[in-house]
């Protein structure tokens, strides 16, 4: 990444930040002024390591991880004060997950403003991973702007409100393995057995791992995921949806 950010790139970043529609006077003012250090931080948040090995989004992504968890905790405390600690942890895990970050990144069309090197540009397997990572870095940069969580919550709370309603109406969508285990226990069945096979060696490949779920020795569902955990979760969701469709659930 060049030390001097050209005018075209500055305008691109400003247009993107305005498109987020963050309802904050402070944010609007700082963007309007085109503060150099702020633009630099957001440019860094939108630069992949394949373009610049030193100044890229990795540090802001690490920072954004902690910021995101705190902002989500704030949201849950305000919106669902009656929730137990366990329920809060389960919900938060979903609204800060890699899958959720990728979905948000696609919603805000972050990919169009991410600077990538030639290697990453041609790597379709890492596309979703980069979108999620850059979105998390964007959140880190937003916090860094003001050294405050306020703007992060002003941006994300409305999104979380919609998503949490959907998740809470169908708990299996965010806690599929636990829901499946409870269902098996309620039917006096053996607990589900998860069989994982690595079918690809590519990092970020959404089909890197395959998972079969067996109940009483019979294969009931299969799914893929970029990690063991995601493959198991996806297979459990598919199986519960199958049970709902057939009236078993």
Where do the language-model regions lie?
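Double-stranded RNA-binding/processing signature
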Residues: 1-249
